[in-house]
């Protein structure tokens, strides 16, 4: 895999390595979907609907015709189509063939198609986790007005392109759809089975720095899922431990994810603060919090995680990142 193999064990980002991993993963998704793909040009890029269908049994889930339609719609999309925004349950949803919508459309869409199956499945999984961890059996998601959140997210994307262009490219390559929901303390999530979709709660996009952090956070989860597709990092991923990113015990594999995204968040926020001295104070406050929680997560992993050979190389790089970020913070 050349540059991609090095990228697997790297906390950071190189454009060539990211492209290599993305292409290899996309080829695997198409291989698994081959029985239900229509004749003609293949999808030019991945999509959460395709990834979700590739994980179903039988392949394609319950709607192979929908998979075929989605595949055809992506044939000319290019490797980085425009980011789509989806608000499940909103009356203003105007879905296209990919099951996403332009939330700025205020026309009458009473006959719009329903929320795509992959998205319903994803929000159901998130609700089940919220109900289990909170004990609130009646917890539910509502459809927020996403316009302010979208504006904050787009401003955050512009900032990321300026202060960390490699991370902006990675996000453009990995994230296809933003799903906006509102419910309790839910902030944000990524699910491996709907790779390409980011689920955002209203609090995660309440300001531009919050949206910037959420973008780094959830793109970071995508990046680590992509790396682990090629190489697992731990052999005891199911062992439960506590770490500073979650209030309840989570598997070791989840703590590795926490450390990865916290390192990305701390680094991106550090670059923003350095590049723009007039950045809002919230930027440095979020950076300091991410760095503090990164140290706590590493301390939770060090005595517990059992690393593979690739995982050991990755963790060594993570330790180097944390050391350099801490030194920069103290200087």
Predicted regions, residues:
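Post-HEXXH active-site segment of zinc metalloproteases
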Residues: 191, 205-214, 222-253
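Auxiliary, metal-adjacent structural segments of Zn-dependent hydrolase domains
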Residues: 130-194, 204-205
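Long, charge-rich alpha-helical interaction segments
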Residues: 250, 267-275, 282-298
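Post-HExxH zinc-binding segment in Zn-dependent metallohydrolases
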Residues: 239-278
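Long, acidic, intrinsically disordered low-complexity segments
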Residues: 151-156, 192-226, 322-331
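N-terminal low-structure segments adjacent to metalloprotease catalytic domains
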Residues: 1-129
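Pan-zinc metallopeptidase signature
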Residues: 284-331
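Extended, composition-driven regions rather than compact fold-specific motifs
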Residues: 191-193, 198, 254, 259-266, ...
């Amino acid at each position: 895999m050349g540059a991609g193999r090095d990228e697997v064990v790297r906390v950071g980002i190189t454009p060539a390595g990211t492209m290599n991993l993305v292409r290899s993963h996309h080829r695997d998704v198409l291989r698994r979907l081959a029985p239900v793909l229509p004749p003609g040009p293949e999808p030019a890029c991945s999509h959460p609907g395709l990834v979700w269908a590739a994980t179903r049994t039988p392949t394609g889930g319950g709607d192979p015709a929908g998979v075929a339609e989605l595949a055809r719609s992506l044939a000319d999309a290019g490797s980085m189509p425009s980011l789509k925004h989806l608000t499940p349950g909103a009356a203003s949803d105007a879905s296209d063939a990919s099951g996403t919508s332009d939330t700025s459309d205020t026309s009458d869409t009473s006959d719009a198609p329903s929320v795509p199956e992959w998205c319903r499945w994803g929000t159901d999984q998130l609700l089940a986790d919220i109900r289990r961890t909170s004990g609130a059996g009646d917890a539910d998601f509502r459809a927020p007005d996403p316009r302010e959140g979208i504006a904050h997210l787009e401003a955050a994307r512009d900032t990321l392109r300026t202060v960390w262009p490699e991370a902006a490219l990675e996000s453009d390559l990995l994230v296809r759809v933003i799903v906006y929901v509102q419910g309790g303390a839910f902030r944000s999530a990524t699910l491996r089975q709907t790779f390409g979709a980011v689920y955002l709660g209203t609090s995660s996009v309440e300001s531009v720095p919050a949206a910037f952090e959420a973008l780094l956070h959830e793109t970071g989860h995508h990046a680590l899922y992509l790396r682990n597709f090629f190489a697992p990092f731990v052999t005891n991923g199911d062992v439960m431990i506590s770490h500073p990113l979650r209030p309840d015990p989570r598997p070791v594999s989840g703590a590795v994810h926490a450390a990865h995204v916290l390192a990305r968040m701390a680094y991106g926020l550090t670059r923003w603060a350095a590049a723009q001295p007039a950045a809002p104070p919230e930027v440095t406050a979020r950076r300091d919090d991410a760095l503090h929680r990164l140290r706590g997560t590493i301390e939770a992993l060090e005595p517990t995680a059992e690393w593979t050979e690739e995982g050991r190389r990755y963790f060594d790089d993570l330790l180097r990142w944390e050391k350099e970020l801490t030194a920069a913070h103290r200087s």
